[in-house]
Design a protein with these regions (language model features):
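A short, acidic, amphipathic alpha-helical segment used as a generic capping/interface helix at domain edges
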Residues: 46-48, 161-175, 186
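Electropositive, gly/pro-rich neighborhoods at or near active sites that engage anionic ligands
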Residues: 1-135
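Short Gly/Thr/Asp-enriched flexible loops that form oxyanion-binding sites at enzyme active sites
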Residues: 186-198
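Extended, charge-rich low-complexity interaction segments
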Residues: 37-41, 168-182
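Gly/Ser/Thr-rich loops at beta-strand to alpha-helix junctions
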Residues: 1, 68-71, 114-118, 180-189, ...
Length: 220
C-alpha cells in the first residue's frame, strides 16, 4: 500500500526488492477476502484498512515476524514507536521450558477466535494437553466468537468495518485483564483497540489455536 501511495519508483529499487508493487494487485486483493476475511476487497475499503493499520502500528510494543519479511520492515518503522522485534515462533509458549504464558495464571483472560466453543472445551481438559502445565495455566477464561468472513461470507454485516465494530462492542462487554486474539484481518485492529481501552492484548493470528491443543492442516 505504501508503494502504491508513493507512486512509480525507480526501476532499480523495484528490481532490488526495496519497494513493492505500485499498483493494486488483484491477486492480493482477492487474498485479503479469501484468506483474511476482508470484504468488500475494493480499492476504497482496502485503502481505509491500510491507513488504519498504519495508525495502529504506533501502538505495537512487541512485534513478531517471519525472517523472510524482516528486510521489508524498514518501510514500516516510521509508523512504529520502537517496538521490540522477535522471531514469530517466540509467541508459541509450548516451545520453551519457561513459557511466557505462565503470567496468565490467576488472570481474567478473554480469547477472540472463531473456534470459541472448542477453545472452551479444550481449556476444560487443559491438564491433558501439555506436560508443562505453565503453557496453559489456571486462569478465568472468557471467549468472544470472532466473525468468520473468509471467502466472501459477510455474515450479515455491510462491510468488514461493520463487523469490526461489532466485535469491539462484544469485547466491551467482557471483564478481563488480557486478551488473546486470532481472527484473520480483524486481529491487529482489535489488539490496538484493546490497548486503547487500557488493557493488554496478544495478537497471535492462526497459531493461537495451538495453545489450546487444536491442530490444523497447515501444521501437519
Amino acid at each position: 500500500y505504501l508503494s502504491i501511495r508513493q507512486g512509480k519508483p525507480l526501476l532499480k529499487k523495484y528490481l532490488r526488492g526495496d519497494v513493492s508493487d505500485w499498483w493494486w494487485n488483484k491477486n492480493v486483493m482477492n487474498q485479503m477476502q479469501n484468506w483474511s476475511g476482508f470484504f468488500p476487497p475494493d480499492i476504497e475499503h482496502l485503502s481505509r484498512f491500510c491507513e488504519m493499520m498504519l495508525q495502529d502500528a504506533s501502538l505495537l510494543d512487541i512485534c513478531g515476524s517471519f525472517e523472510t519479511v524482516q528486510r521489508g520492515l524498514h518501510i514500516l518503522r516510521p509508523y512504529m514507536c520502537n517496538p521490540l522485534f522477535i522471531p514469530l515462533s517466540f509467541f508459541d509458549p509450548f516451545v520453551t521450558s519457561r513459557p511466557w504464558s505462565r503470567v496468565l495464571k490467576g488472570k481474567k483472560v478473554v480469547v477472540i477466535h472463531p473456534f470459541a466453543e472448542l477453545i472452551e472445551a479444550q481449556y476444560a481438559r487443559r491438564s491433558d494437553l501439555f506436560d508443562n502445565k505453565d503453557v496453559l495455566p489456571d486462569f478465568e477464561l472468557r471467549t468472544v466468537k470472532a466473525v468468520q468472513s473468509l471467502g466472501g461470507d459477510n455474515q450479515g454485516f455491510k462491510d468488514w468495518f461493520d463487523a469490526l465494530e461489532w466485535m469491539k462492542r462484544e469485547i466491551g462487554k467482557a471483564d478481563f485483564d488480557i486478551c488473546l486474539i486470532g481472527c484473520g484481518a480483524y486481529g491487529f485492529p482489535l489488539a490496538a483497540h484493546v490497548k486503547k481501552i487500557g488493557k493488554q492484548a496478544v495478537h497471535f493470528g492462526g497459531g493461537l489455536q495451538l495453545m489450546f491443543g487444536i491442530k490444523g492442516i497447515r501444521w501437519k
